[in-house]
Amino acid sequence: MQIFPAIDLKNGQCVRLFQGDFSKKTVVNEDPIAQAKGFATDGATYLHIVDLDGALEGRPINLEVIQKMKTTAKIPVQVGGGIRSMAQVDYYLESGIDRVIIGSAALTDPDFLRAAVQKYGAKIAAGIDAKNGLVATRGWLDVSQVNYLDLAKRMEKVGVETIIYTDISRDGTLTGPNLEQMANLKEHVKVNLIASGGVSSRADLEALAKLGLYGAIAGKALYNRQISMSDIVEVEQIAY
């Protein structure tokens, strides 16, 4: 299973949020470029970067910093946050980003998602963020009436190969991932699934790996040292 150390960017710094609440923000590193390089040096093989400013503004804000993180870390990166037009997708992918995550627009602008998938294939991932099973958009500020599984099935029909699923109620809480929802997704959609939210320990990563998922994202637990990079490297190499 691929494990992605997470770097969330706000005002040019690495931060962690609690349940997606921007008022509950903790700065974990003032230098995101050094953070990206540190993860890579310690064995990370793929980074997950979120432009939180971009998610709020609806356009990429931290482009320059993200490019420097990629060139410094010298490993693949996937990026999300505020990507809502083909021009933005083009810019990221043409600048060397390996995969872009279309979040809010996956729900609000399915034609854009379809066009991006047709143009770039596996370089496009869909981000589904849900609270109590209902999809949230615009930096998690708006909660829709759309069920997470229904949206995942729509994404599969569009041709999306990778879905990143975040349980907002667990994000940044260290209460463990939502194994039930991930197992439900695994059963009903045949795409690469990446779990996000709540990972608190190596045991959580192992439990996700045993579901047969493509990947998992580790954030707060890494910064709090409840998971080490050596844990990540070892879990990635075990066949569950």
Curated annotation (Swiss-Prot):
Primary enzyme class: isomerase
CC terms in the record's Gene Ontology section: cytoplasm
SUPFAM superfamilies, A to Z: Ribulose-phoshate binding barrel (SSF51366)
Gene3D superfamilies, sorted: Aldolase class I (3.20.20.70)
UniProt keyword Cytoplasm, yes or no: yes
Superkingdom classification of source: Bacteria
GO biological process, alphabetically ordered: L-histidine biosynthetic process; L-tryptophan biosynthetic process
Matching InterPro entries: Aldolase_TIM (IPR013785), His_biosynth (IPR006062), HisA_bact_arch (IPR006063), Isoase_HisA-like (IPR044524), Isoase_HisA-like_bact (IPR023016), RibuloseP-bd_barrel (IPR011060)
GO molecular function: 1-(5-phosphoribosyl)-5-[(5-phosphoribosylamino)methylideneamino]imidazole-4-carboxamide isomerase activity
Pfam families recorded: His_biosynth
Pathway: Amino-acid biosynthesis; L-histidine biosynthesis; L-histidine from 5-phospho-alpha-D-ribose 1-diphosphate: step 4/9
UniProt similarity note: Belongs to the HisA/HisF family.
Keywords linked to the UniProt accession: Amino-acid biosynthesis, Cytoplasm, Histidine biosynthesis, Isomerase
Cited HAMAP family: HisA
EC assignment: 5.3.1.16
Active site: D8 (proton acceptor), D129 (proton donor)
Protein name in the entry: 1-(5-phosphoribosyl)-5-[(5-phosphoribosylamino)methylideneamino] imidazole-4-carboxamide isomerase
Record-linked NCBIfam families: 1-(5-phosphoribosyl)-5-[(5-phosphoribosylamino)methylideneamino]imidazole-4-carboxamide isomerase
Record has Isomerase as a keyword: yes
Subcellular location: Cytoplasm
Catalytic activity field: 1-(5-phospho-beta-D-ribosyl)-5-[(5-phospho-beta-D-ribosylamino)methylideneamino]imidazole-4-carboxamide = 5-[(5-phospho-1-deoxy-D-ribulos-1-ylimino)methylamino]-1-(5-phospho-beta-D-ribosyl)imidazole-4-carboxamide
